[in-house]
UniProtKB/Swiss-Prot annotation:
SMART domains: AAA. This is ATP synthase subunit beta. It is a peripheral membrane protein. The keyword Nucleotide-binding applies. InterPro entries: AAA+_ATPase (IPR003593), ATP-synt_VA_C (IPR055190), ATP_synth_F1_bsu (IPR005722), ATPase_a/bsu_AS (IPR020003), ATPase_alpha/beta_chains (IPR050053), ATPase_F1/V1/A1_a/bsu_N (IPR004100), ATPase_F1/V1/A1_a/bsu_N_sf (IPR036121), ATPase_F1/V1/A1_a/bsu_nucl-bd (IPR000194). SUPFAM superfamilies: C-terminal domain of alpha and beta subunits of F1 ATP synthase, N-terminal domain of alpha and beta subunits of F1 ATP synthase, P-loop containing nucleoside triphosphate hydrolases.
């Protein structure tokens, strides 16, 4: 389809109606649904709008990807017969983009050679892999109790300040180091400040590489783009795509698809015999639904339950079905989920749950104990915690850990009223071991090293299982509890206990 020109007939907030004149043969060619159209503003900047509806014979209704300030009736709009596309390839490594693929980091423009449309079909059945594989993260509590599946979808639940961003950062860091993996972060309705913090943390941890010279200038409080080393930038292991909170709903509802398109391009370009495992982060999936609800209302659709769009399940499914494993590689997604008014039956989180393979719940009560990551081991779940997938030893150890923690939770009321002395010897032993297990679930993170001064560690699943079995078998009953806090392997516990003993003497 070639170039089609129309003109603006109506502007209502972020909704723009575009009228097309009849041709010589009394017919009119309209752009297709989801095609992008360009409108040149008086200041020379281009506004992208996306076709959402055909109205009558010669009008389309579009949703703007940026503010519609300065538009007026009669302005020309051009369709090139293409949807919104995202740049791909090594050029996007370490870069920050908006929903239409334009850079927002102050660096050079990206070429659209090999660009991919953001609205795409999910992979065909014959291209999917049916093997169940665990994506080991090097984080003990996740690998043992709620293992992530390669190509799976993980929901990350947590309020403000419990460590969601730090956990996301550590996952990006560990996958980059352990599997030489690549990460894409989609900020859906993100606060601009959070996006800024995330970029700085990624530069600090070396996931995005601006070069040593820039890093030194950043630490001195400057932000000098002339100091960026572009050879280093090409070695970055993450790309960020943001549709910020202040942007129109059209941008916020599409930015997750823009990020996913980049993740798909890295997964699918794997060379023969090489598998690519991509991590895709969405923060926050609730805001994706919320933006879709706003677009639906602006287009005049009848609202469904609790005011959400009637197409909620369709929109969610269209995105989630693209996050999967193919023969070339996998996209594993970690999605932060905000639960409105803590109501899990709300249509937005309820629709998300149906797609998730694992849930990681962060708890404020655990942060109060000083245990980080503050993952709640009893609330978190995984579909692949199955002896046929993870192995019998792993499964049995995980179940024993959950049982001992559950028993400890049940005994807490008795302890708070009557004290430890009133417990039987068996229960007292259970509580003592549970407290050691609870503390051993903590771990120092590489991305938090600058705050804690403790070097981060990655723990293999074999070391994790061995450590927890030793605790539950009573081999560490004589070691003080504080030796288990914020360490990696069981050997680190023994070393820390030795140091504590020397300090006491």
């Amino acid at each position: 389809m070639g170039e089609i020109k129309g003109y603006i007939s109506q502007v209502i907030g972020p909704v723009v109606d575009i009228h097309f004149d009849y041709g010589t043969e009394e017919t009119v060619t309209l752009p297709r649904i989801h095609d992008a159209m360009e409108i040149s503003r008086p200041n020379g900047k281009i506004l992208i709008v996306e076709v959402q509806q055909h109205i009558g014979e010669n009008t389309v209704r579009t949703v703007a990807m940026d503010t519609t300030d300065g538009l007026r009736r009669g302005m020309e709009a051009v369709s090139y017969g293409m949807p919104i596309t995202m740049p791909t390839g090594d050029q996007v490594k370490g870069r920050l983009m908006n929903v239409t693929g334009d850079p927002i980091d102050g660096m050079a423009q990206l070429t659209k050679d090999g660009a991919l449309p953001i609205h795409r079909e999910p992979p065909k059945f014959e291209d999917l892999t049916t093997t169940q594989e665990v994506l080991y993260t090097g984080i003990k509590v996740i690998d043992l109790l709620e293992p992530y599946a390669k190509g799976g979808k993980i929901g990350l639940f947590g309020g403000a300040g419990v460590g969601k961003t730090v956990l996301i950062m550590e996952l990006i860091n560990n996958i980059a180091k352990k599997n030489n993996g690549f990460s894409v972060f989609a900020g859906v309705g993100e606060r601009t400040r959070e996006g800024n913090d995330l970029l700085r943390e990624m530069i600090q941890s070396g996931v995005i590489r601006y070069g040593e010279e820039f890093k030194k200038s950043m630490e001195a409080g400057n932000w000098d783009l002339s100091k960026i080393d572009y050879d280093e930038l090409a070695k970055s292991q993450a790309t960020l795509v943001f549709g910020q909170m202040n942007e129109p709903p059209g941008a916020r509802s599409s930015v997750a698809l823009s990020g996913l398109t980049i993740a798909e391009s890295f997964r699918d370009k794997a060379s023969e015999g090489e598998r690519k495992d991509i991590l895709f982060f969405i923060d926050n999936i609730f805001r994706f639904t919320q933006a879709g609800s706003e677009v639906s209302a602006l287009l005049g659709r009848m609202p469904s339950a609790v005011g959400y769009q009637p197409t909620l399940a369709t929109e969610m499914g269209a995105m989630q079905e693209r996050i999967t494993s193919t023969k070339k590689g996998s996209i594993t997604s970690v999605q932060a989920v905000y639960v409105p008014a803590d109501d899990l039956t709300d249509p937005a989180p309820a629709t998300t749950f149906t797609h998730l393979d694992a849930t990681t719940v962060l708890s404020r009560k655990i942060t109060e104990l000083g245990i980080y990551p503050a993952v709640d081991p009893l609330e978190s779940t995984s579909r692949i915690l199955d002896p046929l997938i993870v192995g019998k030893e792993h499964y049995d150890t995980a179940q024993r850990v959950k049982q001992i923690l559950q028993r400890n939770k049940e005994l807490q009321d008795i302890i708070s009223i009557l004290g430890m002395e009133e417990l039987s010897d068996e229960d007292r032993l259970t509580v003592n071991r549970a407290r050691r297990v609870q503390r051993f679930l903590s771990q120092p993170f590489s991305v938090a090293e600058q705050f804690t001064g403790v070097p981060g560690v990655m723990v293999s699943i074999e070391d994790t299982i061995r450590g927890f079995k030793m605790i539950m078998d009573g081999e560490t009953d004589d070691i003080p509890e504080q030796a288990f806090l914020n360490v990696g392997t069981i050997e680190d516990v023994l070393e820390k206990a030795k140091q504590l003993k020397e300090q006491a003497n």
